Amino acid sequence: MKLNDTIVALATPSGAGAIAIIRVSGPDALEIVAPLFKAKSKKDLAKQPTHTLHLGNVMDGERTIDEVLASVFRAPKSYTGEETVELSCHGSPYIQQEIIQLLIRKSCRSAEAGEFTLRAFLNAKMDLSQAEAVADLINSENAASHQMAMQQMRGGFSNEIQKLREELLNFASLIELELDFAEEDVEFANRDQFKDLVSKIQTVLKRLLDSFATGNVLKNGIPVAIVGEPNVGKSTLLNALLNEERAIVSEIAGTTRDTIEDEMSIGGVGFRFIDTAGIRETKDVVESIGIKKTFEKISQAQVVVYLVDSSQIAVNRERLQQVRIEIEKIKNKFPQKPLLIIANKTDRLADEEIHNLKTKLEEISSHAERAQFLLLSAKTNLGVEELKEKLLEYVNTGALRNSDTIVTNSRHYAALLKALEEINKVEEGLNADLSGDLLAIDIRQALHHFGEITGEITNDDLLGNIFANFCIGK
């Protein structure tokens, strides 16, 4: 990949639309575009100042391809830090390709995936973690993932890491200075102050590492397994939550024979609802496979919703005992997972039956760790909104509300983990009163891992892997 040539790509999604934006960036962007652009104002595009907008036609010789708006961004005041022109044309795929092919014939090169953002990183318009946040922002599908991506893109995470790195670097410099005066036995770095700094860095790193569990699921959607005996209304509940029919709904027990998954946003947080096969004892081979998959999905879920038919357990003691057994199975396998027991089809019950049902469910849930119950009718939507509220209670959204830094990227998590390991070694060295040359080894390694996050320490393979996940026009 040559990074000193001029590149072009479609910056908007491919396909037909009202408008499309074609981005050109590089040292010759204006020199290439200007001769092809006939401004209504008769002005020369190559001589226009930055952040100006111009109406005109893109010309291929004497042929007009389209009437466009040309946006001029002069280096370094552009997204990439280079000379940049963006052509807003009509969204016909034919027009898009005609303009792009014309620019390529005039010596532009087709941009590779993520190359515009790569150039922005290399031109110091953003650091590496901010560049990765651009991809997260593009892929965000709910308020939570959007907020986390925006916070990271604005430099919240980078600033926190950079501050730690600078403070550690100051002490590292003093330690290194001691090595230059080893014969004089001079101590420039106050060891007590250094211990305080190490303790502070450990606290921050542990907080960031702890945030990854929340950040990762918020970014990708909270998985919720909807399980229970066959034909209790799991598919109907899923459809009520999603406001559309996705699962097969039937009066025949066991018709949901595989897992069905869909996504929705509740209170700005993404949830992935997984409707699974029941977990009753069965000799049916196909249904047995579905039951095995149910437990696999429960293991992957953050929250378990166990659905029962209220009209059955309200009058049938044997069925109620079966429910107890099934709940025990789930809690024995997954004692720490939040479990919400939902009595569905309450629209079929009289008031006295509902009262008795509440008493029974209170007794069952009290014997199961981290369990609650809820009365609901998926058919009439009674209790569906309360279910959504309870699901939000299970999610740690406090960090989001407080705008705390939340780690969502597994690469960042790995680098933070390695940095903490090195900082722990520094602490051990300080407590053991090790010499500065030995402390310096671990300090340098910690600084290296901080630099990996922001891109101050990097390599071509790492950059290739990161930016290959971007769309072409970004």
From Swiss-Prot:
EC numbers: 3.6.-.-
Molecular function (Gene Ontology), one example: GTPase activity
Entry keywords, A to Z: Cytoplasm, GTP-binding, Hydrolase, Magnesium, Metal-binding, Nucleotide-binding, Potassium, tRNA processing
CDD domains per UniProt: trmE, TrmE_N
Domain TrmE-type G: 221-396
Keyword Signal: no
Highest taxon, organism lineage: Bacteria
Main location: cytoplasm
Family: Belongs to the TRAFAC class TrmE-Era-EngA-EngB-Septin-like GTPase superfamily. TrmE GTPase family.
Subunit structure: Homodimer. Heterotetramer of two MnmE and two MnmG subunits.
Name assigned to this protein: tRNA modification GTPase MnmE
The organism of origin for this protein: Christiangramia forsetii (strain DSM 17595 / CGMCC 1.15422 / KT0803) (Gramella forsetii)
